[in-house]
Amino acid sequence: ISEHWMSLAGIFNSHLMLAMVVEKFGTEAQKDYWLPRFASGEMRGGLALTEPDAGTDLQGIRTTAQRDGDDYVVTGTKTWISNGIEGSVFATLVKTDPQADPPRRGMSMMILPKHDPETGAPHPGFRTGKRLEKLGYKGIDSAELIFDGLRLDAARHLVGGAEGEGFYMAVGGLELGRINVAARGVGVARRSLYEAAAYARERKTFGKPIGEHQAIQLKLGEMATRVRAAELLVEDAARIYDRGERSDQAAGMAKYFASEAAMENAA
């Protein structure tokens, strides 16, 4: 997909991370309720982690979910959330115990929909903020999500049914995200190679296609090598992830190399 439209793969990635959280960590009842809606496209969304004052420092988030009987009341703001405008549901990292030490022990993951999946009625307390403009990568929207006393029942919306596990769920989602970003890098690098090779056959100098000049052949060879190496790193990371093993190192290596390959081949 990324060979033709990288932003579209980004839309899928955010939705896949949402689905992964429920598939991997949700209760059986949550899986039965949410996953068919995610798979059919009835609902799509993403992973809401980042806040105005907490990016890479996930333990610094301020969005809270306070228990009130059988419900939670969510208050806070998320920002730079992919699919924030067009999406309708988000796996959202919150603090259920703001006083926990270390902070990660007080963090939980909740499924927060903009509207009731059954009636379609908007949820009071969930508001989409402004669309955030980017320099590029405009095919996927980014936005603020604002929670102002959003009330939802615990059984359906607290992932896994237990507090304090959200940090580990978020990290698991990021592993999948890194592999997806790496795959996107492969797509861009591969398309760059195809376009370069096609141009090398078409453009002529000194009476022959430039692809017959050794200097161009060396450049194309380097591009092809980067593509193949990136493919292997992505496949390795994906296999490790699919086996249920820890894949953060392999995913990080694949993301780094494939994104560099995309930049170098495109340049």
Show the residue positions of the predicted features.
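Alpha-helical interface subdomain recognition
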Residues: 1-2, 9, 25-30, 37, ...
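Active-site nucleophile and cofactor-binding loops and adjacent substrate-binding regions
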Residues: 8-15
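A short, Trp-centered hydrophobic/proline-enriched beta-strand micro-motif
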Residues: 41-49, 93
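Active-site-adjacent elements of ketosynthase-type condensing enzymes
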Residues: 53-61, 122
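Flexible, small-/acidic-enriched active-site or ligand-binding loops
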Residues: 118-149
